[in-house]
Swiss-Prot record:
UniProt keywords, alphabetically: Cytoplasm, Exonuclease, Hydrolase, Magnesium, Nonsense-mediated mRNA decay, Nuclease, RNA-binding, rRNA processing
Lineage: Eukaryota, Fungi, Dikarya, Ascomycota, Taphrinomycotina
EC number(s) reported in the record: 3.1.13.-
InterPro entries found in the cross-reference section: 5_3_exoribonuclease (IPR027073), 5_3_exoribonuclease_1 (IPR016494), Rib_uL2_dom2 (IPR014722), SH3_12 (IPR041385), XRN1_D1 (IPR040992), XRN1_D1_sf (IPR047007), XRN1_D2_D3 (IPR041106), Xrn1_helical (IPR041412)
GO biological process: nuclear-transcribed mRNA catabolic process; nuclear-transcribed mRNA catabolic process, nonsense-mediated decay; rapid tRNA decay; rRNA catabolic process; rRNA processing
Major subcellular location class: cytoplasm
Residue ranges with Basic residues bias: 1275-1286
Broad enzyme group: hydrolase
Cofactor(s) needed: Mg(2+)
Function: Multifunctional protein that exhibits several independent functions at different levels of the cellular processes. 5'-3' exonuclease component of the nonsense-mediated mRNA decay (NMD) which is a highly conserved mRNA degradation pathway, an RNA surveillance system whose role is to identify and rid cells of mRNA with premature termination codons and thus prevents accumulation of potentially harmful truncated proteins. Involved in the degradation of several hypomodified mature tRNA species and participates in the 5'-processing or the degradation of the snoRNA precursors and rRNA processing.
Protein name as catalogued: 5'-3' exoribonuclease 1
Family, similarity comment: Belongs to the 5'-3' exonuclease family.
Pfam families named in the record: SH3_12, XRN1_D1, XRN1_D2_D3, XRN_M, XRN_N
């Protein structure tokens, strides 16, 4: 099914399922699974963009690495990272893969021809995305790079060192997501499986939702990029840091589906089981779309097809006797009930199409109203023919007899057969077709076995049968005219289907054998897909050998098929390549096979047509068209390839084989040399990562578990961070509500949750007294802890004051705000989230939790964000949760020797050598002994000086001054500096400069900014607009005349030769690089590329010579900063543009101890340009050199220009009057060490031939664990890379920041106890 369409439908029907990831407000996860093919496509090419030159391949690799790192940092898995690349797929999937690849190649070819016809530039070389197919040299190279990347991360990144990493590459058979599900399915069958394992699966396919649901693990989320529609999907930043991600919570989707089918609790005549309803839901979704079978005609997700399936399911299941999907096996008799109801729907589609044809002469798209059909159609029989009345009376007599069955001829009309099926369904009878020994075909009706057989159930069943018989007794007979009309309708209906089969598959509806074979193949396909999802691939060779599905009513003809799949084996990589690639992608297959794709004498040349038909088949989007190409004959393909096998090289033979997945882990006492996967770019590694083949646990004597695991936590008792509606008392219903998720109100129904006010009997004052000054949980249903600082009703404010609550009257302005706040909250929750909670009597003002903070003694205490005060209706807060979040658990200080064992990495917070790397070697008398990387004095102020000097030369003028300077109308200036759209027929053309964006609250760095008085523009803007005016004076004469006029047309602006003049304007704007200018939020303070270039030039001159470390004794714990402590200490730092910083985490994309300069400041993040390049570095949207930039959280770096955590040392005092040469120790022990001991070996220098020798940071003080590789494997010459990046800071720097303006924390312990924190806002700490 279409991904955007399904996501939109689901988001509007179940509006709280998806959660935007903001900061770290997500659950903790044990396992992260990456469906890698989506990442590969994202990082190698743009969708449908054939005009851009391809990226260099090394940039693709780095983009892939960055994407993996970015997702890892978002989720931070605790136990497992599983990366799965698509391997050779089952034949059933190859049909779709083959169609997509043929279409991709044809689209690229057509785009080139179109560009040539229009005289447009087109790149000579293009990236063929078809290379992302198992067996290509590109995929082999990607695997090699990923192996290197994993070794690098496990060796250097602390967050990768305590987990298991599994990589399943293109040489492991199976689709990526199904390899992942096989892993989960097998693990779940093991006795040691934790039923509360927390899963996160990244991927773009809609079927991942189904795979997640069928796991029946409630602690399961899907991670995906933001889905945008319309203009919002364009003009995005290229920086990965700016990409929004969503979590789709299957815990909430499960509960939404429980709401969806809640009426079934009272209507089912068998045991209600949500897990089995979820299994049925998965099967129903297959009818709307899947990757293995064409969709049934007329069922479209965006038109309400799933809602229709739900409606039919609720209607027929009460009499079904059980569920349709029985642990992955289809109950055909129960599926038949669904298909019978769908047959009535198909007739309505037919009538709508006939009506549309008569009215408009166009039957391509039936004007059928799904919603009206679902809500108004009862499908009750309005009248019966004489024959049908006779059949009814015979069955009525049969019910009162003691006969076990009754038979009818199988030759009765299809209309009468449908009547009998419907009657049997209503009477809970079984309807089937049989063949007697003599070959006679009969329709047999028998009593259906019931799940319950007690007397009460028998009595209920009998009462229902009596009601049905009474209803049919009262159905009138059709008169002759009506009967004739019905026959004609049926005749036209058959002809409609006959036209379909003749045009789509080349045989007639009346060819019963061919139609039955097609229907049986489709039903066989449904079972194959269900097996594939629940048990894994049950046949590698099976596939659906038609381009189209049968009509819905004809699927019934295939329900008697005998299912018998033969497992077979997967295609080898080259067989898959030759099966799915078009001739236009022949360069991707081994040379010896290419002739088979293009030579007219090739025995399989018919597999590779250059031209082929596309059939929209009722779909609207061009990419949804059916590609009409031949199916692959497996035997012919393999025979043809066998004749060429002898010409394969040894490397190609290796690439044509299968391998097992690989598992990676850290070995503490192991080091090995790992050669570069790309010597021109990456250095060799000294790795501590070991790899070995991975195999799944044995399933011998075990069965796959379908359903909930024993011991799983559900609902309000689920694992922390996994949302549930059950934390508050509520009800839910499916109604038309006009939910607005994507900017427009939905016309489809949504599940609306109505929260009950359990405190309605209390006054607002009583409720306030219960909550104010307490900790509660807000953001229902996701929940996060918060501190209630105050509360307000329409008359009073209630505030926490020491140990009491103060009540005061509202000021007049507060009274006026009360009504607006309440109405805004009610509307927001109602229209965006589908939550109703009645009127608001009390609003709580809360400060959300910010995290944990370290005290000076090393304890952890909660802090609440003092810069954020949020309003929440009292009805939507939760007082307690079942499981506390371990991420916010306070703790006492551990002993020094426990928290700082030998070998611990840290950063020094002493006055001298502030921010320099250090390493713990021991502990004595509750004080630490460290090796400290000292550095000579260096000015840490140069960044600020450079920025201030550059900004002093950058003049900005109010817009009215600029208008005067340019001698144009102020309104014209506003238009021309914005997006200025003029009409060109049905299109809109932009002749504006896009230098300001009011609606988006964005400015363009170096060109515009907005003050409290309005927009201001720089000299650059003045010069650019002046050039625009001088280049097109006639245009501006016209625009000046019409400065106040809206809705200008191209003809208005260019009266003569409008097409050529418009093209000239657009070309000029393009040549000026307007679209490449950097847009940022108005709130963001950032530097443009010109200033950043000066910063990079200055940084390149800094001496980064490695310094001999000094041994320092008597260092207190609060004079050191461990990487694991950064969030709890550095969260309130202040920064200014130009500040010098050092990266102080031992995980993430930036090398530890890397120095850089702040070039952008946001609320929670900084843009930093680092002195030396590193593998994951970016260009910060084109503002800095490649591999230098990165957006980091404020707590990831230590500000060394403005030191805010300085600890005074005795050595620091002594140094002011008696400065030693190079060996001054710091701390209370003044013993000096002139050189390191033998336990501090000099780390190895990477090979000099690597470009990364000049780019990658090499933090020497943190390389104690490394052992040099064999001398013969190391390149002899040294490189710049081996110098590292440990720039020293100014030893006499005296600036002391107060910290806290970014949100001074509100601490816990009743929030009034004072702690002696390591952060001393009024000055330095004194070491005694």
């Amino acid at each position: 099914m279409g991904i955007p369409k399904f996501f939109r439908w689901m988001s509007e029907r179940y509006p709280l399922c998806s959660q935007l990831i903001e900061n770290d407000r997500i659950p903790e996860f044990d396992n992260l699974y990456l469906d890698m093919n989506g990442i590969l496509h994202n990082c190698t090419h743009k969708n449908d963009d054939h005009s851009s030159p391809p990226l260099p391949e090394e940039e693709m690799y780095i983009a892939i690495f960055n994407y993996i790192e970015h997702l890892f940092e978002k989720i931070k898995p605790k136990k497992l990272l599983y990366m799965a690349v698509d391997g050779c797929a089952p034949r059933a999937k190859m049909n779709q893969q083959r169609s997509r690849r043929f279409r991709t190649a044809k689209d690229a070819h057509d785009a080139r021809l179109k560009a040539e016809r229009n005289g447009e530039d087109f790149p000579e070389e293009q990236f063929d995305s078809n290379c992302i197919t198992p067996g290509t040299t590109f995929m082999e190279r990607v695997s090699r790079q990923l192996y290197y990347f994993i070794h690098k991360k496990v060796t250097n990144d602390s967050q990768w060192q305590n987990i298991e990493v599994i990589f399943s590459g293109h040489d492991c058979p199976g689709e990526g997501e199904h390899k992942i599900m096989e892993y989960i399915r097998t693990q779940k069958a093991q006795p040691s499986y934790n039923p509360n394992t927390r899963h996160c699966l990244y991927g773009l396919d809609a079927d991942l939702i189904m795979l997640g649901l069928l796991s029946h693990d409630p602690h399961f989320c899907l991670l995906r990029e933001e889905v945008t529609f319309g203009p919002a999907s364009r003009n995005r930043s290229k920086e990965l840091a700016h990409q929004k991600f969503y979590l789709l919570h299957l815990s909430l989707l499960r509960e939404y589906l429980e709401f969806e089918f809640q009426e079934c609790r009272s209507t089912f005549t068998f045991k209600y089981d949500l897990e089995k309803i979820l299994d049925d839901f998965i099967l129903l979704a297959f009818f709307v779309g899947n990757d293995f079978l064409p969709h049934l005609p007329g069922l479209h997700i965006n038109e309400g097809a799933l809602a229709l399936m739900f409606s039919i399911y609720k209607k027929v299941m009460p009499s079904a006797g059980g569920y349709i999907n029985e642990k992955g096996v289809i109950n055909m008799a129960r599926l038949e009930l669904i298909l019978l109801e769908l047959e009535n729907f198909e007739k309505e589609i037919f009538k709508a199409e006939v009506s549309e044809t008569k009215n408009n002469g166009n039957s391509d798209k039936p004007s059928f109203d799904f919603l009206k059909y679902i809500t108004e159609s009862t499908n009750d029989i309005k009248a019966m023919t004489g024959e049908q009345k006779n059949y009814f009376l015979q069955i009525k007599k049969f019910l009162s007899s003691r006969e076990p069955f009754i038979d009818f001829s199988a030759n009765i009309s299809s209309v009468d057969q449908r009547f009998l099926r419907r009657l049997c369904n209503d009477l809970h009878l079984s309807f089937s077709k049989i063949i007697k020994v003599d070959g006679t075909h009969l329709l047999r009706i028998t009593f259906r076995d019931l799940e319950f057989n007690d007397e009460d159930e028998d009595e209920i069943e009998q009462d229902e049968i009596e009601r049905v018989l009474q209803k049919y007794d009262n159905i009138p007979l059709l008169n002759e005219e009506q009967a004739l009309k019905e026959k004609n309708v049926e005749k036209d209906f058959i002809q409609w289907k006959d036209d379909y089969y003749r045009s789509k598959v080349g045989f007639s509806y009346y060819d019963e054998e061919a139609l039955k074979a097609m229907a049986e193949r489709y039903v066989e396909g449904l079972q194959w897909v269900l097996f594939y999802y629940y048990r894994g691939c049950q046949s590698w060779g099976w596939y659906y050998n038609y381009h189209f599905a049968p009509k819905i009513s004809d699927v019934l003809k295939g329900l008697d098929v005998k299912i018998d799949f033969k497992m077979g084996t997967p295609f080898r990589p080259f067989e898959q390549l030759m099966a799915v690639l078009p001739a236009r992608s022949q360069a991707l297959v081994p040379p010896c096979f290419r002739d088979l794709m293009v030579n007219s004498e090739s025995p399989i040349i018919d597999f590779y047509p250059e031209n082929f038909a596309l059939d929209q088949n009722g779909k609207t989007a061009s990419w949804e068209a059916v590609v009409i190409i031949p199916f692959i004959d497996e035997t012919r393909l393999i025979d043809a390839l066998a004749s060429k096998d002898k010409f394969l090289t040894e490397e190609e033979r290796k690439r044509n084989s299968f391998n097992a997945p690989t598992v990676f882990s850290l070995a503490e006492d192991y080091t090995s040399f790992y050669p570069s996967s790309l010597p021109s770019l990456f250095p060799d590694l000294v790795t501590r990562c070991i790899q070995k083949p991975y195999s799944l646990p044995s399933m011998e004597g075990k069965e796959y578990l379908v359903g909930l695991c024993p011991g799983v936590f559900l609902g309000a008792f689920g694992m922390v961070g996994f949302p549930s509606f059950h934390t508050l008392k509520h009800k839910a219903e499916l109604v038309y509500h006009g939910i607005n998720v994507f900017g427009n109100e939905s016309r489809n129904p949504s599940v609306i949750v109505n929260v009950e006010d359990v405190k309605s009997a209390l006054t607002s004052e009583q409720i306030a007294m219960q909550y104010v000054g307490k900790r509660i949980f807000v953001d229902w249903p996701y929940l996060r802890e918060a501190y209630v600082e105050s509360a307000m009703d329409e008359s009073y404010m209630y505030l926490a004051s020491n140990s009491t609550i103060e009540k005061r009257d509202l000021a007049e302005i507060e009274k006026s705000q009360w009504g607006r706040k309440c109405s805004h909250k009610i509307r927001e929750y109602s229209k965006r989230f589908g939550v109703l909670f009645g009127d608001i009597s009390l609003l709580l003002q809360v400060r959300p939790i910010k995290g944990l903070e370290y005290t000076r003694e090393g304890a952890l205490v909660k802090i609440f964000n003092e810069s954020v005060l949020e309003d929440y209706p009292a009805q939507l807060v939760v007082e307690k949760i079942a499981i506390d979040d371990p991420r916010f658990t306070e703790r006492e200080a551990p002993p020094v020797e426990v928290e700082y064992p030998p070998g611990t990495k840290a950063f020094h917070l002493g006055e001298y050598n502030y921010g320099r790397p250090a390493q713990i070697t021991g502990c004595k008398d509750n004080k630490l002994i460290i090796w400290l990387s000292t550095a000579p004095g260096l000015d840490a102020q140069w960044g600020r000086v450079l920025v201030n000097d550059s900004k002093s030369k950058e003049k900005y003028y109010p817009s009215y001054i600029v208008a005067k300077l340019l001698n144009i109308h102020p309104l014209l200036l506003s238009k021309i500096t914005s997006s200025f759209l003029i009409s060109n027929g049905t299109k809109r053309e932009n002749i504006g400069l896009n230098l300001k964006f009011d609606a988006r609250n964005q400015k363009v760095l170096g060109f515009s900014r907005k003050s409290t008085k309005g927009w201001e523009f720089s000299n650059k803007t003045v010069a650019l607009v002046k050039e625009y005016i001088n280049t097109f004076p006639q245009l501006f004469n016209i625009l000046t005349t019409h400065a106040t006029k809206d809705n200008l047309t191209v003809k208005d602006c260019f009266p003569k030769d409008d097409t050529q003049q418009l093209a000239a304007v657009k070309h000029w704007i393009k040549e000026k690089g307007i679209n490449s200018l950097t847009r940022v939020s108005l709130d963001e303070d950032a530097l443009d590329s010109d200033i950043i270039k000066l910063i990079e030039e200055k940084a390149s001159t800094i001496d980064s010579t490695y310094q001999v470390p000094k041994k320092v004794f008597g260092v207190p714990r609060y004079a050191l900063l461990k990487p694991s402590q950064t969030r709890g200490i550095l969260h309130s730092q202040e920064f200014a543009l130009g500040d010098r910083v050092v990266y102080v985490q031992d995980s993430g994309k930036v090398p530890i101890a890397a120095y850089g300069t702040v070039v952008g400041i946001m609320l929670h993040h900084l843009d930093v340009v680092f002195d030396l390049p590193f593998m994951s570095g970016t260009t910060l949207d084109g503002r800095c050199s490649p591999y230098h930039g990165m957006q980091v959280e404020v707590s990831m770096v230590l500000n060394v220009t403005n030191p805010q955590f300085v600890v005074n040392t005795r050595a620091g005092k002594n140094r002011k009057t008696n400065v030693s040469a190079n060996n001054v120790s710091q701390g209370t022990d003044s013993r000096l060490v002139t050189k390191p001991t033998s336990t501090f070996p000099s780390p190895p220098s990477p090979p000099s031939s690597s470009v990364w020798n000049k780019r990658e940071h090499h933090p020497k003080p943190f390389s104690l664990h490394q052992v040099p590789p064999p001398e013969s494997l190391i390149h002899k010459s040294k490189s710049k890379f081996s110098k590292g990046n440990h720039h020293s800071t100014n030893g006499t720097q005296s600036i002391r920041g107060r910290g806290g303006k970014r949100g001074k924390p509100l601490r816990s312990k009743e929030l009034n106890r004072k702690h002696d924190h390591i952060v001393q806002p009024m000055g330095k700490l004194q070491i005694n």
